[in-house]
């Protein structure tokens, strides 16, 4: 339905709301081919990209060779063991690892690594997928009549572990889907002060005519206005497909 455009714009504006001023050092952990890394580099940040998938890092390196604003580095690395000195970054982005790491201990390891590499007062922006995303997506796209898809959704709602035994790529890969409050707790458990918990898209991502609305500037602004108005409302945060939590490493 094209709602990734809403996700990307809202993620960027939420990052900038909490980001230090450039030319601060930013680690984009799980940064894939650099969708957010290159954007931040263009804004003047010193960005180091890390991803566990060599193919994606290769794409980022090739892009970096011709980028007008280059990344400091592009490296293959595991979010749970970053090849970075302690207290070396002003901001860490974890915009994928927390839903790709299904085991809670692995997620805590990734968050602990982010805490270690951040300087005191440094910012973390971590993304999650809502526990309810597959149910709402299935409802919007009329997929819940499919028994196999409905079974996947039932499991998602029980324990948050999204398992896709089918060959349908639209059903996403194995992942962990957070309740909003659990994402907050995971950051707090490793020592972060949580400064904001946001629903990224609001309700608009579920609209069947999303692309038509987004392509109309006036209707697009309405989608954004509603997403911003509801972003911190606890009763509806989980209706967004994606969650974003902002935390800060204490200075004391």
Q: Model segments located where?
A:
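Conserved alpha-helix/loop element of class I SAM-dependent methyltransferases that forms part
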Residues: 5-22
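Conserved class I S-adenosyl-L-methionine
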Residues: 23-30, 123-156
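Class I SAM-dependent methyltransferase SAM/SAH-binding core
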Residues: 27, 35-81
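A short acidic, Gly/Pro-enriched loop at the edge of an enzyme's catalytic core
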Residues: 80-92
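Acceptor-substrate binding/catalytic loop of class I
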Residues: 101, 167-181
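A short glycine-rich, Lys/Arg-flanked "PGG" loop and its adjoining helix->strand segment in the class I
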Residues: 108-120
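C-terminal lobe and adjacent flexible extensions of AdoMet/dcAdoMet transferase-like proteins
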Residues: 186, 190-252
């Amino acid at each position: 339905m094209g709602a990734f455009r809403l996700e990307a714009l809202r993620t960027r504006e939420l990052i900038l709301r909490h980001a230090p001023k450039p030319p601060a050092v930013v680690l984009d952990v799980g940064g894939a081919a650099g969708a957010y890394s290159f954007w931040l580099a263009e804004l003047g940040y010193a960005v180091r990209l890390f991803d566990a998938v060599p193919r994606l890092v290769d794409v980022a390196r090739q892009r970096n060779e011709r980028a007008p604003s280059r990344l400091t580095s592009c490296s293959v690395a595991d979010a749970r063991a970053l090849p970075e000195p302690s207290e070396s970054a002003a901001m860490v982005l974890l915009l994928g690892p927390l839903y790709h790491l299904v085991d809670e201990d692995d997620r805590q390891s990734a968050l602990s690594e982010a805490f270690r590499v951040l300087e005191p007062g440094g910012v973390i922006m971590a993304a999650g997928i809502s526990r309810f995303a597959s149910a709402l997506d299935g409802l919007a796209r009329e997929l819940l009549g499919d028994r196999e898809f409905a079974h996947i959704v039932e499991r998602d709602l029980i324990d948050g572990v999204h398992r896709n035994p089918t060959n349908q790529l639209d059903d996403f890969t194995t992942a962990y889907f957070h309740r909003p409050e659990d994402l907050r707790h995971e950051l707090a458990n490793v020592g972060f002060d949580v400064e904001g918990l946001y629903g990224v898209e609001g309700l608009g991502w579920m609209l069947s005519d999303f692309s038509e609305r987004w392509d109309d500037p006036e209707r697009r602004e309405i989608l954004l206005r509603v997403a911003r108005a509801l972003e911190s409302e606890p009763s509806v945060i989980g209706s967004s497909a994606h969650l974003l939590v902002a935390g800060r490493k204490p200075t004391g």
